[in-house]
């Protein structure tokens, strides 16, 4: 059960709780400078923290609307207390505290959420009384704090904390805290176009029939990826080796895989082709290749049972297609753009220039780069989604927003997903109001269907996902 209570007096409120414990799982525009050789941002996005003082106790506070708050309105949030211990938890109090000074920048937001920064000055805005919680039990309360108790807040991102303290004298000392944020908009919110990589790592060169059967089964990872993006404005970045693996099998291809491919190509989403096997174009440009590696001859992939026979684990360039070979369209994806590259990691200006000619027949391309490739982005600032490097047009994926949405996409648990979305919203505040932000989800073979859908739609503004927006 979930109890819903409106706080009726400032600072000291009693909220009725469900009589029985609920046992559930809880997880919780700027001018562009030339890219600089800074390290790639590889640390996970900070999420609202749940810090227990003893093993087994977790506290989560998740403001509604992904943390978005209108000054003067009631603050509504979900408060979850989970007791993973084998003994019951005594009654206590959850103190709600709000910082009145907005966090200065993204780094300050990240440090607050991940617990690496000391708490700033916080003011109490309410107390929630908790009852005894059984071992391995979870209680969940909808909290409503009147706007008068929250107070007026100027646009900004504000630290919000919940602290649990045991009340009963003589009971084991128990405490925990949860850090989160309130986001007060400064104008029209930024909208996010999210690029979703559709990939699957094979054990060999190409996915085998056995692997495809598992991946495209009702509970398979590739099925979950299509389920997650269906009906959303996601931009799809598809590894053509998946398509090739299905087509080279011919009549030996699993029926579920054939149906999956048909479904993929029927989706209305904008999509582009990754390099074959998601090969990294940065490394190829660094090696001085004037054209990207490609697989033009699929004959080596055809074995007696329709499985790959070549031991070569990486794409190899060929100059001609031998007679009798499978046509080069084997890896073609219906409706996919071929003028977009998504290199991994950081790049140099020279590499961007080289990759700008990696299109078909030496045609032009546009690379998607992480914002950390740029001076401002490396310092934690927001960077415009469009720009140029040395005369080459580029798209820029916001690294902080991408990391937070990637964390959300990986979560099947609503509480954990909600925390990641609050982080994304807090980071988005620092983008220009009304701007379009590009986010690129991390490459991952498995994602939660619910998490992926939520990550794509949470900040899309209901608009179509297109790279030319």
Residue ranges and their predicted role:
Residues 1-41:
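Secretory targeting and sorting signals
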Residues 44-59:
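Proline/serine/threonine-rich low-complexity linkers at boundaries of modular beta-sandwich domains
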Residues 81-88:
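Asparagine-centered strand-capping/turn motif at beta-strand->loop junctions
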Residues 82, 227-228, 234, 320-469:
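Catalytic grooves of carbohydrate-active enzymes
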Residues 97-121:
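Short aromatic-acidic-glycine turn motif
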Residues 149-160:
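Short glycine/proline/serine/threonine-rich loop/turn segments at secondary-structure transition edges
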Residues 178-266, 270-273:
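Active-site beta->alpha N-cap acidic-glycine motif
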Residues 230-345, 349-351, 358, 392, ...:
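Metal-dependent polysaccharide deacetylase catalytic core of the NodB/CE4 family, i.e.
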